[in-house]
Amino acid sequence: MPSFDVVNKVEMQELDNAVNNVKKEVDTRYDFRNSVTEIELHRGDKRIHLLAGDEMKMRALQDMLQSHCIRRKVDPKCLEFKDIEPTSKGQVKRDVVIQEGITKDVAQKIVKKIKDSKLKVQAAIQDDQVRVTGKKIDDLQEVIQLLRGEEFGVPLQFVNMKA
């Protein structure tokens, strides 16, 4: 039976490229001259650490990160920005958590949406992904269109399509 998986994966190399592009842009921008600004990607615990001189620069850094992620085809919905915290040197810092995988409640919403559509497919939650199977590939493509039209708070990718 044809099937596919609904997943939430972040291409870490593309995210690394986006972070490096932000670093280059910070070096060349006039409004960031003579200020301490850091952005670094921690691959192990899947987070990005931002450090800026003040909140205005932090907002600019956040906007640059989101726009560079879009350019690199990384959905900015996978970035969860934590609260801005002051540091001892009068600067501000912020952690950005990279969300990967589909949580249980989001997976349940996806399965409920598929079941409510009355299409002849079955959806099953498997760890951090949802497997959708059906008798016809056309039904599976309708499910993909249905899920693309909805907002679940996380970016969704459709992989492993088997006929």
UniProtKB/Swiss-Prot annotation:
SUPFAM superfamilies in the record: YajQ-like
User: Which GO MF term does the entry hold, naming one?
Assistant: nucleotide binding
Q: Which UniProt keywords apply?
A: Nucleotide-binding
Q: Name one Pfam family in it.
A: DUF520
Taxonomically, the superkingdom here is Bacteria
Q: Which GO terms describe its cellular component?
A: cytosol
Q: Which InterPro entries match?
A: DUF520 (IPR007551), UPF0234-like_C (IPR035571), UPF0234_N (IPR035570), YajQ-like_sf (IPR036183)
According to its UniProt entry, what is the function of this protein? Nucleotide-binding protein.
Checking NCBIfam families in the record gives: PRK05412.1
What HAMAP family would the database entry show? YajQ
Q: Which family does it belong to?
A: Belongs to the YajQ family.
- Name the UniProt record assigns to this protein: Nucleotide-binding protein DvMF_3058
